[in-house]
């Protein structure tokens, strides 16, 4: 067998090996693309979670304004009460109910803030995991690139770059959102503490005002009772006197009046 015949006999074997290598590369590329698609879906879910967090923060801001407005109304009502010194039973019940509802709202509000912080930490952890996965995909791409098949890998390289860009953008957005959320959380905590203190002050003022009101009422009642007893005593004394004594008292009174005239 000459050299030409030997070369021809080797070609089918080389073509078969090349086909196998290309087939393996194709399968691995498809697997990598599927993995990238999963990561893209995961990033989309993280975006939705972040949007929900933004909406929730805006809702909490709105509720904070409502609580502040409600607290200002209570301040106005309490100031009006202290100025007038008059508090009916219905107003006392209403103020107690408003204070109770305010504390319940604040406790529920604080609990919701804690839940949001937990959700945001979970979202940040998932984003970090997605970043590590993208780095691993890039490593796999570099390994395949070293096999000198740029035509086969071009699509996967492009997908990997897009995925990395998307992850980087998502991480920046999450960092900004986390910073805003932290600032809002600090302000919310201060407002929560302030509202709790104000509510307690309202209850103390209400208690003191009720004590003062009760003391005044008891004093007036005692004074009225004493006056009534004095009048009754005077009437009894007058009725016990005889007609002649009354006439003498009246004459004495008239003489005193004439003397002043």
Swiss-Prot record:
GO cellular component term, pick one: mating projection actin fusion focus
Parts forming coiled coils: 16-147
Domain of life: Eukaryota
Any one GO BP annotation for this protein: mating projection actin fusion focus assembly
Compartment(s) where it occurs, according to its Swiss-Prot or TrEMBL record: Cytoplasm
Keywords: Coiled coil, Cytoplasm
Name of protein: Uncharacterized protein P8B7.02
